[in-house]
């Protein structure tokens, strides 16, 4: 043990003998992966299953949502998985992280994905396909999929496979529709933003769903109706000099969580990619 943890054999400046070293070891990993062009995602940060007994072994990984605030430069985190998630609630921890990005306190936003603690079919009632991450890509190539993951052009969905809901459109545009941004992008506007939402489901579904529109951590509007659902909503919100973000979530026919769209009332630009991943 001494030899393996001694220089020059150690690959990390941290060891298990100096107490809790906080976020530093994880930040080192995040920084190293980013420097090499990789992506990093925090997984299951609120799960309760990390504290349990496995025969003679006691596992203790307590819920740790605070890492989303304490760490910097990670690509994103799991907004949906097989446990209760609260950090995505309006005004919650995710919105605080995104607001920090809007205010210039963070260089990168944090994107959401779906993950599954999946081991085998029907264990705990789960099936492969219950947790899905949807991608907005022009071509289904490895390069385009990874770029969408890096830049937040994705959404997360939890359902009961093969039933599903699909986010066909979530966009913010100018009133005349000439400029438009989708998840992971930023749009500069000189007037009220127009939000468009289209959600469809599997062929047999006419389920009624409930969609929440969230602006910079504040619940703005709730839309309800059967699938397929189409919404056009002009938000009477124009704040020169401010930077805001919009995101949505959906309940009832499963759960769907979008990634944010940023609106900049400060810059004379049209649409650009937010600084992601």
Regions found by a protein language model. Give the residues of each.
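Active-site segment of extracytoplasmic enzymes that catalyze sulfate/phosphate-ester chemistry
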Residues: 1-12
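Domain-core and long-helix interface of multi-subunit machines
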Residues: 13-126, 203-220, 244, 248-250
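C-terminal functional module detector
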Residues: 101-111, 116-277
């Amino acid at each position: 043990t001494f030899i393996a943890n001694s220089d020059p054999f150690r690959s990390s400046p941290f060891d298990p003998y100096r107490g809790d070293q906080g976020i530093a070891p994880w930040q080192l990993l995040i920084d190293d992966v980013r420097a090499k062009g990789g992506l990093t995602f925090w997984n299951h940060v609120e799960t309760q299953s990390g504290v349990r007994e496995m025969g003679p072994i006691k596992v203790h990984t307590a819920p740790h949502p605070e890492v989303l605030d304490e760490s910097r430069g990670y690509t994103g985190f799991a907004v949906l998985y097989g446990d209760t998630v609260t950090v995505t609630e309006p005004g919650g921890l995710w919105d605080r992280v995104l607001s920090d990005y809007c205010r210039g306190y963070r260089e990168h936003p944090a994107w959401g994905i779906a993950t599954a603690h999946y081991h085998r079919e029907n264990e705990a009632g789960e099936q492969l396909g219950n947790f899905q991450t949807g991608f907005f890509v022009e071509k289904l190539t490895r390069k385009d999929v990874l770029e969408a993951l890096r830049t937040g052009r994705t959404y997360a969905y939890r359902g009961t496979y093969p039933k599903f809901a699909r986010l066909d459109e979530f966009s913010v545009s100018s009133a005349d529709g000439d400029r438009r941004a989708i998840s992971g992008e930023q749009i500069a506007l000189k007037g009220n933003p127009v939000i468009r939402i289209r959600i469809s489901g599997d062929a047999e579904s006419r389920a009624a769903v409930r969609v929440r529109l969230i602006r910079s951590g504040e619940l703005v509007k709730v839309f309800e109706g059967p699938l397929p659902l189409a919404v056009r909503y002009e938000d009477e919100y124009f704040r020169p000099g401010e930077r805001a973000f919009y995101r949505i979530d959906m309940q009832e026919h499963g759960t769907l969580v979008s990634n944010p769209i940023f609106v900049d009332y400060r810059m004379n630009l049209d649409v650009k990619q937010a600084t992601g991943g």
